[in-house]
Each structure stands twice: as structure tokens, then as C-alpha cells.
Amino acid sequence: TSDNSFVAEMQVTSRRPVYNSTYITTLINYRDTKFEFNYTPGESLDLSNITLSNNLVAVISFYSYVVIGLDFDSFSLNGGAPYFARAMEIANMAQSLNTKGWEPFSGKNDNRYDLAVALTDESSKAFHSFWYNYHRNGLDEMAANASRGRIRIIQAMADLQKLYDSRPSSPLLLIIGETKLDEIVRICSQATAEEKQAVKKQLNQIFPTKGYLINNLK
């Protein structure tokens, strides 16, 4: 917008390998449309545990902890908790910056503060259970036994339903919808007819705008 002042969008993407295979699964594909910051060439970018004075540092640090947390969560139950807690601390400190994207409880899916709350709130514990079981007990099993891995993924969707029932507007559902929906449909295409119909019904309830993708499950 002016010298040293920038308005941008950020696409945050992270992937992880699936055990004993060449397949790579996406953990986050998140678009942040409220990224405003000041930067002077040569300026030192340091993260403090006490205060924040630069939104560029705040946003990059925040998403770094979210990405690391999602990765750890996919390998061990609640393994990402320390990193999500740090992201929440950054979101709280960023309130002093008075910049877009950090407004508390905005109800918007692309708000960093609301994402941090969702990742740390007790009401979202079903997400962490789903995330771990889907990846570690589901995807990571498929190379050894595709049927067993698929069944565990379908079983993990009970936690996805719990998340939707408790927080139907959770930004975590956006993350799942953007990274896992197509994958679930492809995996469940090999399920029984009864399983396919149950999965399709559940996904259409949770992701009503994604019918064009979900209804490929036949």
C-alpha cells in the first residue's frame, strides 16, 4: 500500500508421507486473506516470548506452530498440543497489533485467533482424536492392509461427526474439508455398498457445499 507497508494473501500448505508408501497426504491447505504487515529491508525479524511488535513475525510464527502441531498430532494422540498452545499465545499477544485476522471470536473461518481457539479448546478434542486415528491408524496401515486401514478411517469418522455436532462452524472442519474430503472419497470407493452410503450421508451433512465431490462415492 505504501513504502514498507504491504497487504497480501497467504496460502499455508503442509504435507506428510504415509508410512511404508510413496503416497503424500496433505495436512493443511489454508488461505489467509487478511495478511497486512510492515517491513523495512534489513530489518531483524525476531520472535519474543513476551511481546509482539511486527505482524509479519506474528503471522509466520503462528502458522509455523500450527503446521508443526498438525504434523505431530498425526503421529501421536494430542502430540501437537504444545505447539497449538504456543500458537494460542501468539494469537493473544497479537491483540496489541490491532491488525486484521486476529479479532477474537469473529466467527469467520479465515481468522487466526478463532483457529487457535479451535485447536486448543476442549470442545474440539474430537478433532485431535480423528486426526490421529485417521492418519496413524488409518492411512499408515493401508500399505500393509488396505482393508484394515480403510475400516479404521471409516471408524475415525465418528469423531468427525462429534466435532460437527459440537462445533458445526469450526474452522477445523474447513481444514478437513480442504485436505481430507477428496482423499476419504477415494479411499471409501473400495468400501462395501452399505459403508459407501453411510459415509456419503455423513459427509453430505457435515460438508453440504461439497456434494459435487462427495457424490462421486457410488
Task: Describe the predicted segments one by one.
Residues S64-L174:
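Extended amphipathic alpha-helical interaction segments
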Residues L139-K218:
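A cross-kingdom marker for long, charged
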Residues N4, S21-T22, D73-G80, S189, ...:
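Short, solvent-exposed secondary-structure capping/transition elements
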Residues S5, N55, V59, I175:
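Short, well-structured alpha-helical interface segments that form or flank functional binding sites
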Residues D3, Y30, L45-N55, A144, ...:
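Surface-exposed peri-terminal alpha-helical interaction modules
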Residues T33-Y83:
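Compositionally biased, intrinsically disordered linkers/stalks adjacent to structured regions
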Residues T1-Q11, V18-N20, L27-N29:
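Start-of-domain marker
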Residues V12-S14, P41:
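A mature extracytoplasmic/lumenal domain signature
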